[in-house]
């Protein structure tokens, strides 16, 4: 995407979703800024643009998208509609009712899977989702994400053998 278009999307997301205060992140770290994924994911215009832009980052050969619940499900749906690639949902933990599965939807043994994520700090949730996909027989070939907060996710994913393709970096949306 041309830089001006990407910056326009980043600016719109910043206006809608950047909160200032004292926040504890999923990783346990603290931050003066919180990029509220639900605020940008629930805006249809932003979600449509994100689906289009993230679709361009999905690795060639991807047969299935995998989206960790709850935050990445809307994004995964937008990317699936843009690419035509089917998706599945990765639960944080298997439920003790219904089918009791950790992966909802279809994941066929041996499929090449791209994870879709929203905001990554250390990548811990993404690594847990990748482990669940691998345990279910999928081959994780990449991860596309909206925002890399640049606090270790890229290195942690690389160490796990997962190519990471973030759409935006911290400096694009969060003040220095």
Question: For the regions a protein language model found, what residue spans apply to each?
Answer:
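PRPP-dependent phosphoribosyltransferase catalytic core
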Residues: 2-12, 131-176
């Amino acid at each position: 995407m041309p830089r001006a278009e990407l910056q326009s999307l980043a600016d719109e997301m910043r206006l809608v979703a950047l909160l200032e205060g004292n926040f504890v992140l999923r990783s346990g770290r603290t931050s003066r800024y919180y990029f509220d994924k639900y605020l940008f994911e629930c805006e249809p215009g932003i979600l449509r643009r994100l689906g289009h832009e993230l679709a361009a980052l999905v690795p060639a050969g991807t047969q299935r998208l995998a989206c960790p619940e709850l935050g990445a499900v809307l994004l995964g749906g937008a990317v699936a509609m843009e690419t035509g690639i089917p998706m599945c949902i990765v639960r944080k933990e298997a439920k003790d009712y219904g089918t009791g599965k950790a992966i909802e939807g279809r994941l066929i043994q041996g499929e090449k899977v791209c994870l879709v994520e929203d905001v990554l700090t250390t990548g811990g949730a993404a690594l847990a989702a990748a482990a669940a996909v691998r345990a279910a027989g999928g081959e994780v070939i990449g991860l596309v994400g909206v925002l890399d907060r640049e606090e270790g996710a890229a290195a942690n994913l690389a160490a796990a053998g997962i190519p990471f393709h973030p759409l935006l970096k911290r400096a694009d949306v969060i003040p220095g």
